[in-house]
């Protein structure tokens, strides 16, 4: 049983690790856990804190995780270190923001061979906004390509942090990790003095669903003491719950009697779903409530929407159960039912960004064994109607009659791109092609930092992939939503055999409608098999056709049985065939194979 709750507040350290993807923060967390003996050797595995298989395989952290480490420092004191591991990817920025709000300080991990990247910047600025004390750590110094001095200079130039006493380490081999532990104790501040006798005030940092214990809530105690058996109240929702268990993560769950000021731990109460626990809410005791709630976080707003449909209509109920379960664990993922003429029943789902979308899709296929079709991702548009109302549009198929629309506004983002300067030309061209507006360009050594305003609609498809291919994988990219701006947007419908296919309709900028329409028609021409009659494939804006391709008909050689003889006989047979084809075209249904949908929707450009 860990030594509990009697730790003096001056011996507690709450810290987060911030870094760009792949700079080694989960590996450093593994080493810290190993060196403080929180897990026995046999329980250690790579990336202990990345609990989902998908996190381990992709080598990314998605959910923020927490662990309590006990450390006997060189000064003879016994310390409790609460580490919160944060995701590095831009889609999970809100996971980072709430992790940082629960701590007083951060370790900034920078790869000594790669240097500062765009997400390093974004996360460090968040840490600075939270008034964090930051200790820079240079990881991977054992690599032949490591240039610690250059990277130190870069940290000072780009971020403006003093890196003269940055700690050189190799998280993989464990070199220098003991210095990190000492720096945490010596250079990072303890939590602000809390009052143990005051009414309970705790920040709800995170919550997730466990099949046995129900919802587990991660809390950071500010004032007061949280004990088993107390009745607590969520100040945001007003819901009351009796506390069943109190514990800490070491990363295993260890039950304790109580948690005091400055500590981070978890509670379980009979809470049925994660949606009942709002992240950033204040938890207090029901009988003796605290006067003021803590300033909360703004809830994560879904930014990208797409339809998810089962390939086999019989799997719809399984899909319903699966999205419900994912929602239990991920409150930022939203969904509602929708139907499509082409694809049947499914769900319209909202995500924080493209990586989030990809991961949810992958989890549905993997954990729940479902075959899915995803429609083209779209963003949330605002329609200002002529009668003065404003409506939000999540699905292009639901767009109101163009006559009723006064203007359409689309979301814009502020993107920060860091790239080696030899790729700058290609990236500038990419941003301009995507209707970007340059806001800033500066240099730090041989790297350029570009700031662009871009419409989110242009980034959603394949911007990231294109950026990586232009820069040979060296550019990094980070963005946040800024505002909505009016845009000359039109709804492009795809017609197959004069029938609109709702799953393929999309909102595009007028200047790009023709290019996108032509590309889509060409793609469908390759994908839809020939029928017995001619099939036109058209892209249209309203009633105006902007692109067309035709799939020619399969035809039987009806004149094969005529040997010589009169030409009018042949003509009669051909005329008869022509009539039949005409009739067939009128009544024939075009079967669009599922594969064609999947391929056509993958098309970014």
UniProtKB/Swiss-Prot annotation:
Top EC group: hydrolase
Molecular function in Gene Ontology: GTP binding; GTPase activity; guanosine tetraphosphate binding; ribosome binding; translation elongation factor activity
Tagged with keyword Cell membrane: yes
Catalyses which reaction(s): GTP + H2O = GDP + phosphate + H(+)
Compartment annotation: Cell inner membrane
CC annotations in GO: plasma membrane
Listed InterPro entries: EF-4 (IPR006297), EFG_III/V (IPR035647), EFG_V-like (IPR000640), EFTu-like_2 (IPR004161), G_TR_CS (IPR031157), LepA_C_sf (IPR038363), LepA_CTD (IPR013842), LepA_IV (IPR035654)
SUPFAM superfamilies, alphabetized: EF-G C-terminal domain-like (SSF54980), P-loop containing nucleoside triphosphate hydrolases (SSF52540)
Binding site for GTP: 22-27, 139-142
Keywords from the named record: Cell inner membrane, Cell membrane, GTP-binding, Hydrolase, Membrane, Nucleotide-binding, Protein biosynthesis
EC assignment: 3.6.5.n1
Keyword match Amino-acid biosynthesis: no
Pfam families: EFG_C (PF00679), GTP_EFTU (PF00009), GTP_EFTU_D2 (PF03144), LepA_C (PF06421)
GO terms classed as biological process: positive regulation of translation
Span of domain tr-type G: 10-192
Chief location of this protein within or outside the cell: membrane
Topology in the lipid bilayer: Peripheral membrane protein
Protein family membership: Belongs to the TRAFAC class translation factor GTPase superfamily. Classic translation factor GTPase family. LepA subfamily.
Its job: Required for accurate and efficient protein synthesis under certain stress conditions. May act as a fidelity factor of the translation reaction, by catalyzing a one-codon backward translocation of tRNAs on improperly translocated ribosomes. Back-translocation proceeds from a post-translocation (POST) complex to a pre-translocation (PRE) complex, thus giving elongation factor G a second chance to translocate the tRNAs correctly. Binds to ribosomes in a GTP-dependent manner.
HAMAP family linked: LepA
Protein name: Elongation factor 4
Organism lineage string: Bacteria, Pseudomonadati, Pseudomonadota, Alphaproteobacteria, Hyphomicrobiales
